[in-house]
Amino acid sequence: MMTRGRKENSNETSPSPTLLLHGGVIDIPLNTDSGVTKNTPGEIALLRFKSVSKLWSSIISSRRDFIESIVTRFLTQPPHDAHFIFGFDSGPYVECFLGLSSTYPPNTDIEAVLSIPGRMAQYVYGLMCCLSGFKDAKKETQGWSRIFFHEMHGFSNWRILGATCGGEILFAKWMYCIYHYEDKLLCVLYYEPKRNSMRGVDVEGTLPNDTRRYRFVIIWTIPDHVQNTMYLY
């Protein structure tokens, strides 16, 4: 009867587990465990706390209030612009710059742009795509449905970079021409599907001082970390 009662009232305070460390007994209340995990950043709580012990793994996997708190905390985060990687082309890719978005603290002495010598490539979920190719790679074609969201002149010159945590779809040009300053500003677009609205943001402070060495700029984006809780259900 006691075991069944604990299962039915899993959200209530339960007797503390007892740990024996170097001859001393330490009691850790279950509600303290869940309180610590709920007040810790989601990626740390789910990935690290789940492996602390079987008890903590059970709390994280079975407590619906804990899972809902992670989702709620993510959804209530204020939206912000994306972070970008800029590749400057003077023929082959010889130099890249890691630039931070407008969320970077202004009026600081810390460099906001980091030079990365060498080639840069696109990536998906942490997997890099080599521009020079790979001999054993197999070419496959995937069919996709074509959905047009927003009518805009010259839309074929833009590509999708990803999405922000606020649900905005991010667009950038396939390539920006900075030779003779044809593209004086690096503009990116944010499309909001619910409102069917588009806003443009000029990314400033990212061009090198001497643009004569470069002809084109390619922009990549760094997506926000999104904690996946689906595997906990």
UniProtKB/Swiss-Prot annotation:
Superkingdom, natural source: Eukaryota
Domain F-box: 22-69
Name of the protein in its database record: Probable F-box protein At3g56670
Highest classification ranks of the organism: Eukaryota, Viridiplantae, Streptophyta, Embryophyta, Tracheophyta
